[in-house]
Design a protein with these regions (language model features):
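Short, solvent-exposed loop/turn at the beta-strand->alpha-helix junction
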Residues: 39-41, 103-104
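Histidine-anchored nucleotide/phosphate-binding helix
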Residues: 14-21, 41-54
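N-terminal basic/disordered segments at the start of proteins
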Residues: 1-27, 37
């Protein structure tokens, strides 16, 4: 099993969306996706394609790069919660918590409560 780490940049998101039918059918790859932009449309469409093709994706719910660098951990967690719950189905998308020095016990508890 291979777990490539994707930073959710536009080209990575589009590549994942277009490869979802092939990758889902082979079931040998489970990408970890950390969004880098607060705009959710492209990432949401990609996650919906992965869900439709049964491609397991590990979605970082509390991203920390680019658009999220200046957000408090609780704010990025809330952003991720909204993205995750906006998906019509979530059987193949798994919420994932990014561990790091800014992660507080309160954010960890909130993640456990939500997911």
């Amino acid at each position: 099993m291979y777990f490539p780490y994707l930073h959710g940049k536009q080209k990575e998101v589009l590549a994942l969306r277009h490869l979802a039918p092939l990758l889902g059918s082979e079931a040998r790859l489970q990408p970890v996706l950390e969004p880098v932009r607060q705009a959710t449309t492209s990432v949401r469409h990609t996650l919906e394609a992965c869900e439709a093709h049964r491609l397991q994706v590990w979605l970082v719910i509390n991203p920390v790069r680019q658009d999220f660098e200046l957000l408090a951990p609780a704010q990025s967690l809330e952003w991720g919660r909204q993205l995750f719950t906006s998906l019509p189905t979530r059987q193949w998308i798994h919420p994932t918590l990014m561990l790091g020095p800014a992660l507080t016990p309160a954010v960890l508890r909130r993640f456990v409560q939500l997911f």
